[in-house]
UniProtKB/Swiss-Prot annotation:
Enzyme Commission numbers on file: 2.1.1.199
Protein name per its UniProtKB record: Ribosomal RNA small subunit methyltransferase H
Family the UniProt entry places it in: Belongs to the methyltransferase superfamily. RsmH family.
GO molecular function, one term: rRNA (cytosine-N4-)-methyltransferase activity
Function, in words: Specifically methylates the N4 position of cytidine in position 1402 (C1402) of 16S rRNA.
Intracellular or extracellular location(s): Cytoplasm
The species this protein was found in: Clostridium botulinum (strain Alaska E43 / Type E3)
InterPro entries assigned to the protein according to its UniProt record, in alphabetical order: RsmH, SAM-dep_MeTrfase_MraW_recog, SAM-dependent_MTases_sf
Pfam families for this protein: Methyltransf_5 (PF01795)
Binding-site residues for S-adenosyl-L-methionine, renumbered to this chain: A33, G34, H35, D53, F79, D100, Q107
Catalytic activity: cytidine(1402) in 16S rRNA + S-adenosyl-L-methionine = N(4)-methylcytidine(1402) in 16S rRNA + S-adenosyl-L-homocysteine + H(+)
Highest taxon, organism lineage: Bacteria
Alphabetized UniProt keyword annotations: Cytoplasm, Methyltransferase, rRNA processing, S-adenosyl-L-methionine, Transferase
GO CC terms in record: cytoplasm
Length: 310
């Protein structure tokens, strides 16, 4: 299957990174290389792009798309490892870092990956298929309380208690093996009126399980910190999020780096000695235009936040 993915907030990201033609840039979520191909077009032969992705299919597609460029290094890894990756490449500092935290259209549309609640497939949801831990283990082995907590916390699902209870009851008969089995269980757990209103009834639960499988939120804070430490002064970090949980983490971390002072508010001056390491380029998240949402409905919930290293 062709690796299709429409780059979200493309022009906004390119502007955000303030690309220098001889700079070094890291795309932490290379995917189909939509953003990266445009970054490379702005680089001279002295510039360099480092593309990281934990999905081998994505790396293969990116190499094909970027084959005309020689100034690219490909890394099969999780962006959580950005510090070691740059150390191994003997690159102390970079000019820009991009993270697109969305699931690619390819991953959603290829049924076999198990990300979609619209297509039947084995319960998987692994971004990195070299890992053993998948959605199957979560659905069939987590306790009811553990299921409840991830569905509530990562999916912000108001019927988390009912859904986790239904999952545990159903799997007592036989293991839950496919996405459609799970969808049916979720639908049965949610009241009919709620099913008829709002998004697909399985959307939030699938999001929660995917986040847990890939440790998406657990690694984000540390990755931002490590990335900022690797930026040159004036270097920029741009992060695209697609749901409120991610955006909240990014927003709060950016604010903390911009204002790390821990002194009580009533103190007339700072005595803790903690200095800002970044400035906020965008105070508010940048959202797609109406035109972009019409062309690519999956961009609707996207939000871009940008910081610059001091």
């Amino acid at each position: 299957m062709e690796f299709k993915h429409i780059s979200v907030l493309l022009n906004e990201c390119l502007d955000a990174l303030d690309i220098k033609d001889n700079g070094i840039y890291v795309d932490c979520t290379l995917g189909g290389a939509g953003h990266s191909s445009h970054i490379l077009e702005r680089l001279s032969n002295e510039g360099l792009l480092i593309g990281i992705d934990q999905d081998r299919d994505a790396l293969k597609a990116a190499k094909e798309r970027l084959k005309r460029f020689e100034n690219v290094k490909y890394v099969h890894s999780n962006f959580y490892d950005i510090d070691n990756i740059l150390q191994n490449l003997d690159i102390p500092k970079v000019d820009g870092i991009l993270m697109d935290l969305g699931v690619s259209s390819y991953q959603l549309d290829e049924g076999a990956r198990g990300f979609s609640y619209m297509k039947d497939a084995p319960l998987d949801m692994r971004m990195n298929r070299d890992n053993d831990f998948s959605a199957y283990e979560i659905v069939n082995e987590y306790s009811e309380d553990e299921l409840y907590k991830i569905i509530r916390n990562y999916g912000e699902e108001r019927f988390a208690k009912r859904i986790s209870n239904c999952i545990v009851n159903r799997r007592s008969d036989k293991p839950i093996e496919t996405t459609m089995e799970l969808v049916d269980i979720i639908k049965a757990a949610i009241p009919a009126k709620a099913r008829r209103e709002g998004p697909h009834p399985a959307k939030r639960t699938f999001q929660a399980i995917r986040i847990e499988v890939n440790s998406e939120l657990k690694i984000l804070n540390q990755t931002i910190e490590d990335g900022v430490n690797r930026l040159k002064p004036g270097g920029r970090m741009a992060i695209i999020t697609f749901h409120s949980l991610e955006d909240r983490i990014v927003k709060l971390k950016f604010r903390e780096l911009n204002d790390p002072c821990t002194c009580p508010r009533e103190f007339p001056m700072c005595i803790c000695g903690k200095k800002p390491s970044v400035r906020l380029v965008s105070r508010k998240g940048i959202e797609p235009t109406k035109e972009e949402v019409e062309e690519n409905p999956r961009s609707r919930s996207a939000k871009l936040r940008i910081i610059e290293k001091l």
